Regions:
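Transmembrane alpha-helix termini and helix-breaking/packing motifs in multi-pass membrane transporters
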Residues: 1, 183-208
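Loop-to-transmembrane helix entry/capping segments in MFS-fold secondary transporters
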Residues: 74-75, 162-178
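C-terminal ends and interior cores of transmembrane alpha-helices
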Residues: 113-131
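Residue-level signature of mid-helix packing/kink "hotspots" within the transmembrane helices
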Residues: 85-93, 184
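Juxtamembrane helix-start elements in MFS-like secondary transporters
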Residues: 73-81, 129, 133, 211
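Helix-to-loop junctions at the C-terminal end of transmembrane segments
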Residues: 90-106
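Hydrophobic core of transmembrane alpha-helices in multi-pass small-molecule transporters
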Residues: 130-148, 154
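Intracellular loop-helix junctions on the cytosolic face of multi-pass helical membrane proteins
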Residues: 1-64, 68-69, 73, 209-243
Length: 243
């Protein structure tokens, strides 16, 4: 089971890790500021990217713990993790082909809504009705599939408007740092925070297990923030449903 869990974790990081071997030439701060002023989508999209990955990685880091300890499915945790990533992987090309007729941000909004809807059922899962968690895996797997492709396409579209390849490289690297920061922050808070509270026997909210706070309440709250940010982005930059 440990081997299966390792495989599942590897697949997850494979999705999000990026190769940034290129080394852009030096560029002035004035050019960067000028580019930001001329393309206000960058800062708004950076916030969406950070919080979206933050929410996703909260659940990814605590998946095994939630399934093993809270649902009591220790022997099946690795299989469920692989099932989740398999559904996500299968749904990714479907989002791509489906998305050809729609705008990127509309698809991201739709995927976020699907994820929030599916993840909401976590509130009703327990060791006595763990079967409900299979529905969570299926729905959220489809919703998260959009996060593996659409944000990258949207970023590419934003940077395509810039004729200076060096600036594009800098902001591609910048977004890579944002992604890695989100992964690191999520891992630090989720694993360290939850682990510490469990070790000292302290509950953040009375009658609510800490694992439900870190695995469910925090991520779904962040996802709702992401949904609001995406909707504001579409409204601010007049992004229609159709691409």
């Amino acid at each position: 089971m440990i081997f299966l869990a390792i495989i599942g974790t590897f697949i997850f990081y494979l999705f999000y890790e990026e190769n940034i071997n290129f080394k852009p030439q030096s560029i002035s701060l004035a050019q960067i500021i000028s580019f930001l002023k001329g393309n206000k989508k960058i800062s708004n999209f950076a916030l969406i990217t950070f919080f979206n990955l933050l929410a996703n990685n909260f659940t990814a880091n605590l998946f095994i713990i939630f399934v093993s300890n809270y649902l009591g499915l220790k022997d099946y945790a690795g299989y469920l993790l692989i099932l989740y990533f398999t559904i996500t992987l299968i749904s990714t090309p479907l989002w791509y082909f489906f998305g050809k007729n729609f705008s990127n941000m509309y698809l991201l909004q739709l995927g976020t809504i699907i994820t929030i809807f599916g993840f909401f059922f976590v509130a009703f899962t327990s060791a006595n009705n763990w079967e409900l968690y299979m529905l969570v895996i299926f729905i959220t797997g489809i919703g998260i599939g959009v996060d593996l492709i659409i944000p990258q396409i949207e970023l590419a579209d934003i940077l395509d408007n810039n004729k200076d390849n060096r600036l594009s490289q800098i902001f591609t690297s910048f977004f890579s740092i944002i992604r890695k920061a989100a992964i690191g922050v999520a891992a630090g808070i989720a694993l360290t925070g939850y682990g510490y509270l469990e070790n000292v026997g302290f509950s953040l909210i009375l009658d609510i297990p800490n694992i439900m706070i870190f695995y469910f309440i925090v991520p779904i709250s962040i996802k709702i923030i992401v949904l609001i940010l995406v909707m504001r982005y579409r409204s601010k930059f007049h992004v229609s449903v159709r691409g």
